[in-house]
Amino acid sequence: MGPIPRSITRTLSRFRTELTSESSPLVIHELKVAKYKVSASLQYLAFLVFLPWGISISFQEGLGPWVTNWWNTGQSKIFFSYLQEENALERFGEIEELFLLERMVEDSSETHSQDLRIEIHRKTIQLVKMYNKDCIQIISHLLTNMICFAISSAYFIMSKKKLTVLNSWIQELFYSLSDTMKAFSIISVTDLCIGFHSTHGWELMIDSISENYGFVHNEQIISGLVPTFPVISDTIFKYWIFRHFNRISPPLVVIYHSMNE
């Protein structure tokens, strides 16, 4: 068996048969079903990829002015202050260092001391504005993510038929491969997404999610999750492969372990 899935060659064979006027009504029906599976699956995948992205952009622009006005009224500053408390303390620590520097040089020049006070005051206002902007962005991201999750979940529930078609199409593509190509595909996906070679990708993803939800970058938490989560996921996935494919195709399990080693 070559690297081209049998489902694709079958579809091309049906199409060629139809062009040569050798087709029967059953073959035409099968060809239409195959075309529907491909188009419905690709449309569903496109919606899953671009729907959250489009919702995020549209609601970020729409919620921005409302969140800014709501935050500036001072109704929830205390409630959300803990989200960026560590970051704010670190920034204002710089101001404290500048005050200490001022005390050291205030005897040398009164003019210089006055300029330093002005600079410290300006820097303080700048940091307060930056902190205020960060808090507004955190709230906007939280609201946008909740709305995006709700809409995506509703679409996912309402489109169970397309999900069934997508699942059928993927299974047809996968099971039409040879055992060697199946094992190669599984190893490629696992190493790329959840394997031991994807630790840097997990680090970037965890850092991006934490910043998106307003949590301060914590190197200890990231360094603890990155080496642990891929190992657990890889172990669970290998166990599932052994339980599932050992009943369907035992040679695939043997080839998978041989290639993985």
From Swiss-Prot:
Predominant localisation class: plastid
Keyword list, A-Z: Antiport, Chloroplast, Hydrogen ion transport, Ion transport, Membrane, Plastid, Plastid inner membrane, Potassium, Potassium transport, Transmembrane, Transmembrane helix, Transport
Any GO MF annotation of the entry: proton transmembrane transporter activity
Membrane topology of the entry: Multi-pass membrane protein
GO biological process, one term: potassium ion transport
Gene Ontology cellular component terms for the protein in this record: chloroplast inner membrane
Transmembrane segments: 47-67, 138-158
Localization: Plastid, Chloroplast inner membrane
Catalysed transformations (reactions): K(+)(in) + H(+)(out) = K(+)(out) + H(+)(in)
InterPro entries: CemA
Family: Belongs to the CemA family.
Function: Contributes to K(+)/H(+) antiport activity by supporting proton efflux to control proton extrusion and homeostasis in chloroplasts in a light-dependent manner to modulate photosynthesis. Prevents excessive induction of non-photochemical quenching (NPQ) under continuous-light conditions. Indirectly promotes efficient inorganic carbon uptake into chloroplasts.
The protein's name in its UniProt record: Potassium/proton antiporter CemA
The organism of origin for this protein: Ginkgo biloba (Ginkgo)
Higher taxonomy: Eukaryota, Viridiplantae, Streptophyta, Embryophyta, Tracheophyta
Gene symbol of the encoding locus: cemA
